[in-house]
């Protein structure tokens, strides 16, 4: 069984390939011509399913027998911002780049009079294939701070300190991050489903 990732985000592709290294993984653009997918769901799960369905439906009939489309939709929910940016995390600033998104998050938090806040990451993984549709979830709790720290990671990692740590995700090694991340937790559950489907 082969897995096609329904993302063109290079950071996500690397992270997903690392965590799912027991499987034969292909990035979206290794199999299909890239195309835009409108994420108009109201939850992380809905958006993950929209992406996985779109990619699976773009495969030809032979490919559909060989591939499962796997998608991740994830984001950060900040308490003092009433759960925002949430499903809009990737495009929070309107510009769609990580630095602008981080700057906006910090500015919104400071406007409300806070230098830090409880926050949590959410990841929803969706899998779509001939055998049906499946989804898993993972969360990681901690806090966001108003100063970026660390060079690793992407997204909001340089602002997020996981519970039980005194470093941001961007200060942790790839292995340290992958062992505690929301995406890792969701993918560990997804692996169980994928192994069952592979036997089926």
From Swiss-Prot:
Gene Ontology cellular component annotations, sorted alphabetically: cytosol
Q: Quick one: which residues bind substrate?
A: 7-12, 74, 154-157, 177, 182-183
Q: What class of enzyme is it?
A: hydrolase
Keywords linked to the UniProt accession: Hydrolase, Magnesium, Metal-binding, Nucleotide metabolism, Nucleotide-binding
Q: Does the keyword Nucleotide-binding apply?
A: yes
User: Which amino acid positions bind Mg(2+), per UniProt?
Assistant: 38, 73
Supply the InterPro entries for this chain.
dITP/XTP_pyrophosphatase, ITPase-like_fam, RdgB/HAM1
Supply one GO BP term. Answer: purine nucleoside triphosphate catabolic process
- The residues annotated as the active site are 73
CDD domains in the cross-refs = HAM1
**Disulfide partners:** none
The enzyme's E.C. designation: 3.6.1.66
Q: Which Pfam families match?
A: Ham1p_like
Oligomer and partners:
Homodimer.
- Role summary: Pyrophosphatase that catalyzes the hydrolysis of nucleoside triphosphates to their monophosphate derivatives, with a high preference for the non-canonical purine nucleotides XTP (xanthosine triphosphate), dITP (deoxyinosine triphosphate) and ITP. Seems to function as a house-cleaning enzyme that removes non-canonical purine nucleotides from the nucleotide pool, thus preventing their incorporation into DNA/RNA and avoiding chromosomal lesions.
What is the name of the protein in this document?
A: dITP/XTP pyrophosphatase
């Amino acid at each position: 069984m082969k897995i096609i990732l329904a993302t063109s985000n290079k950071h996500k592709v690397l992270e997903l390939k690392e965590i799912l290294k027991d499987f034969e993984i292909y990035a979206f653009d290794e199999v299909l011509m890239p195309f835009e997918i409108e994420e108009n769901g109201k939850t992380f799960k809905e958006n993950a399913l929209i992406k996985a369905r779109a990619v699976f439906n773009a495969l030809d009939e032979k490919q559909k027998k060989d591939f499962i489309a796997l998608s991740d939709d994830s984001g950060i929910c900040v308490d003092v911002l009433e759960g925002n940016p949430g499903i809009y995390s990737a495009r929070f600033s309107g510009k769609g780049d990580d630095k602008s998104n981080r700057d906006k998050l910090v500015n919104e938090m400071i406007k409300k009079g806070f230098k830090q806040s409880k926050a949590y990451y959410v990841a929803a993984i969706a899998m779509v294939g001939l055998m049906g549709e499946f989804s898993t979830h993972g969360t990681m709790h901690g806090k966001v701070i108003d100063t970026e720290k660390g060079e690793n990671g992407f997204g909001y990692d340089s602002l997020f300190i996981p519970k039980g740590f005194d470093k941001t995700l961007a200060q942790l090694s790839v292995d340290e991050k992958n062992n505690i991340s929301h995406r890792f937790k969701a993918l560990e559950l997804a692996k169980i489903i994928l192994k069952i489907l592979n036997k089926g």
